[in-house]
Every structure is written in structure tokens, then in C-alpha cells.
């Protein structure tokens, strides 16, 4: 599902990829897999979440991202969301979570 990314400075980044669909039907499984990858990674590094493939989602996607953000913070790591669909950014704003989840988000046109 995911592969390590190129190094950022001297600390390698962890690359996590969101699936095409992330909603209530698969959020628990996706979250468990991504959290395990993040949990097993070294602390203090950049963890990039690539949302390029994400096309269909609901608020469960935000819950998954929030859980990843919390774990990254606990590990002293930084989480960055890449290529977020415009609709995901809008959903985060609707829930008042844009500053927490999307501070440096690079969104893609949808």
C-alpha cells in the first residue's frame, strides 16, 4: 500500500498513501494499516500522506487523518498531507479542522 519516500535532510521520510476510497466501510482497516506503519517508523521524521489516489471519501477520512496526526505528534514527527482533493480540504474546513489537519496541505484540482 505504501513505500518509503526519499530522504528529507538526513532523516528519511515515511510515505503513506491513501486509497482510492476511504469511507465508513473501510476506514477502520485503512487506519489500522497506516497507524501501524507510522507506529513502526522512527520518531522525529516527516511522514507524508499522499492523497493522490483518493477519489471517494466521507468524514471517516478526516478521522483517519486526525488519528495519524495525533500519533505523529506523540512520536515527535510531522505529518504532511500531499495532493489533497479540493473536496477533502473543503470538508476539513466545514468541520473546522483545516488548521489542525491541513496547515501546509498541497491540494490537487478535482
How would you label these PLM feature ranges?
Residues 1-57, 67-110:
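STAS-like cytosolic regulatory interaction modules
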Amino acid at each position: 500500500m505504501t513505500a518509503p519516500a526519499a530522504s528529507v535532510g538526513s532523516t528519511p521520510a515515511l510515505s503513506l498513501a491513501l486509497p482510492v476510497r476511504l469511507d465508513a466501510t473501510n476506514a477502520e482497516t485503512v487506519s489500522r494499516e497506516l497507524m501501524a506503519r507510522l507506529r513502526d517508523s522512527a520518531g522525529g521524521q516527516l511522514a507524508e500522506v499522499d492523497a493522490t489516489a483518493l477519489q471517494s471519501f466521507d468524514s471517516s477520512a478526516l478521522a483517519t487523518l486526525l488519528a495519524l496526526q495525533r500519533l505523529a505528534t506523540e512520536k515527535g514527527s510531522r505529518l504532511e498531507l500531499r495532493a489533497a482533493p479540493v473536496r477533502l480540504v473543503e470538508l476539513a474546513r466545514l468541520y473546522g479542522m483545516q488548521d489542525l489537519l491541513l496547515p501546509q496541505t498541497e491540494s490537487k484540482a478535482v
